[in-house]
Amino acid sequence: MYSNKTIVDILKYLNNNINTKISIDEISKIFMYDKAYLMRLFKKELNITIIDYVNSVRIYNSIKQLKSDSNLLHISLSNGFNSLEYFSETFKNIIGVNPSTFRKFLKLDRSITLDEFVECTNSMSNLNIFINRIDKYIKNVKTNSNYKKVLTIFK
């Protein structure tokens, strides 16, 4: 089964604008769909809300920066979060530990507990699976060239 072209277009838009302020109202205006319909369609196709998708991608992108010595405020703002508090809360909801603990995990700091280590490992695995699933969804869209039909009455 092919991916929904509208959802693929929305995913591409979100990915291209992931570090900027994104609102459901803005998306519904750009794609000319009712906000409620768009949210239902997105959830039905991907089994995740638009906001959860955006937050997951932002957290995934921020993980790369956590390997550096950049401060957490800079990382949160550069990945589209309004505040360090919202970034930390979202990070903990998705990854299971706060960004500082995850940074220790990335740097193989021995001060993290075994439970934190397991949580970080499992969360990273799940996040990678999610990102790969979305990438496959985007690549599985049926292009317009496949819809070419010839009307036999005009031959």
Role assignments for model-derived ranges:
Residues 1-19, 25-41, 145, 150-152:
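An amphipathic alpha-helical interaction segment
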Residues 89-155:
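…primarily DNA-binding HTH/wHTH and HhH modules…
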Residues 17, 37, 41, 57, ...:
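Generic alpha-helical secondary structure signal
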Residues 8-16, 21, 25, 44-82, ...:
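Terminal helix-turn-helix DNA-binding modules in bacterial transcription factors
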Residues 24, 30, 35-42, 66-103, ...:
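Sequence-specific DNA-binding recognition helix
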